[in-house]
């Protein structure tokens, strides 16, 4: 099995990259892909860059060049569920765009023409992630993760997301684009991210302060999940 892992930022991939043995680097289209073994399991780790276009481009390059069997999207996210705090884990059961609107033509808010309203994560990957959460004794929430090309930092953007997606547990900038590409390629995916901030007016300050905490927690989760997927 080869496992694809995607993070947007240097801070989100550096701890995992340092653990990859026999590492080789491919630089293509503004993305970096690191291949090798993580605790004996073949992995391809992508640093995509921030935002939906960068994530979609990188995910496509990763799938085409490395042919992973599954995709794990890792990194940080803004918490929307009331029980979440910095360092907690969110696991996707679905991903949707929060900034797409073609409702004038009868589509659901967040749905693009020719696409489902949301992109469902793989049940087996979700179950494996939840097993790892129990093993690591982490606080986590599973649910809808929404994505858009905006850092949510205040009441207006937050209120709009809560209105359109009242069940969303987290918000970030890449996951749905990655899920969209995986859907088109028919490759199973799951989003496993750690909370770096609560999406409020102080979120930009919290993000800068707690990104390292989120990166450490998400790395722990991904490393454990890779082991679980490879060895059962």
From Swiss-Prot:
The primary gene name is mtnN
- Give the metabolic or biological pathway: Amino-acid biosynthesis; L-methionine biosynthesis via salvage pathway; S-methyl-5-thio-alpha-D-ribose 1-phosphate from S-methyl-5'-thioadenosine (hydrolase route): step 1/2
Q: Which GO terms describe its molecular function?
A: adenosylhomocysteine nucleosidase activity; methylthioadenosine nucleosidase activity
- Record text on subunit structure and interactions: Homodimer.
What is the protein's name according to its record?
Answer: 5'-methylthioadenosine/S-adenosylhomocysteine nucleosidase
Has keyword Oxidoreductase?
no
Enumerate the residues binding substrate.
78, 152, 173-174
Coiled coil: which residue ranges?
none
**Which PANTHER family does its entry note?**
5'-METHYLTHIOADENOSINE/S-ADENOSYLHOMOCYSTEINE NUCLEOSIDASE, 5'-METHYLTHIOADENOSINE_S-ADENOSYLHOMOCYSTEINE NUCLEOSIDASE
Which residues are catalytic? 12, 197
**InterPro entries reported in the protein's UniProt record:** MTA_SAH_Nsdase (IPR010049), Nucleoside_phosphorylase_d (IPR000845), Nucleoside_phosphorylase_sf (IPR035994)
BP GO terms, sorted: L-methionine salvage from methylthioadenosine; L-methionine salvage from S-adenosylmethionine; purine deoxyribonucleoside catabolic process
* Listed SUPFAM superfamilies: Purine and uridine phosphorylases
**Top EC class of this enzyme:** hydrolase
Q: What family does the Swiss-Prot or TrEMBL record give for this protein?
A: Belongs to the PNP/UDP phosphorylase family. MtnN subfamily.
Entry GO terms, CC: cytosol
Domain of life where this protein originates:
Bacteria
């Amino acid at each position: 099995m080869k496992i694809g892992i995607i993070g947007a930022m240097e801070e989100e991939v550096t701890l995992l990259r340092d653990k990859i043995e026999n590492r080789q680097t491919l630089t293509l289209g503004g993305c970096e892909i690191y291949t090798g073994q993580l605790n004996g399991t073949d992995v391809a780790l992508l640093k995509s860059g921030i935002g939906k276009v960068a994530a979609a481009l990188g995910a496509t390059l990763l799938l085409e060049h490395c042919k992973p069997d599954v995709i794990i999207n890792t990194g940080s996210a803004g918490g929307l569920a009331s029980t979440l705090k910095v360092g907690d884990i969110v696991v996707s059961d679905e991903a949707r765009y929060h900034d797409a609107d073609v409702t004038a033509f009868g589509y659901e808010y967040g749905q693009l023409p020719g696409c489902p309203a949301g992109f469902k994560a793989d049940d087996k990957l979700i179950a494996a992630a939840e097993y790892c959460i129990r093993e690591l004794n982490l606080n986590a929430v599973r649910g809808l993760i929404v994505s858009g090309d905006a850092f949510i930092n205040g009441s207006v953007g937050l209120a709009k997301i809560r209105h359109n997606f009242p069940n969303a547990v987290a918000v970030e900038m890449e996951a749905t684009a990655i899920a969209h590409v995986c859907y088109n390629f028919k490759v199973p995916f799951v989003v496993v991210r750690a909370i770096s901030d609560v999406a409020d007016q102080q979120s930009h300050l919290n993000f800068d302060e707690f990104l390292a905490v989120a990166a450490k927690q998400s790395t722990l989760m991904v490393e454990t999940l890779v082991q679980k997927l490879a060895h059962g």
